[in-house]
Amino acid sequence: MNLTYLRSFYTTVKCNSISKAAKQLHLTQPGVSMQIQKLENDINFKLLNRSNTGVSLTSAGEIIFEFAESMLSIEDNLQKN
């Protein structure tokens, strides 16, 4: 599982928006969208429901979001040390 894609997914959920996540990550909106799609393809599950009002997690997305939170926290701690 690609941590860059996982970070894009995590940030999108936290921002409730792909475009807001893209700004925060200094990426383009299509780039973030593509990373999330690749993550979904890698694990064979849809993670997000996309709408004009934002994004919401699917049941698989809820599980992966918790996993992402743990993995990204570990990665951040490793980079600090």
Functional labels for PLM-detected ranges:
Residues 2-5, 29, 61:
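The N-cap/first-turn positions of alpha helices
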Residues 6-13, 58, 65:
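Hydrophobic residues on short alpha-helical segments
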Residues 10-26:
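Short helix-boundary/capping micro-motifs
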Residues 17-18, 36, 50:
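Helix-turn-helix DNA-binding elements, focusing on the entry/boundary residues of the two helices
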Residues 23-24, 41, 62:
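Alpha-helical residues within the helix-turn-helix
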Residues 40-57:
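A short LG(V/I)-centered, amphipathic sequence patch enriched
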Residues 42-43, 64-81:
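Alpha-helical linker/hinge and terminal dimerization helices associated
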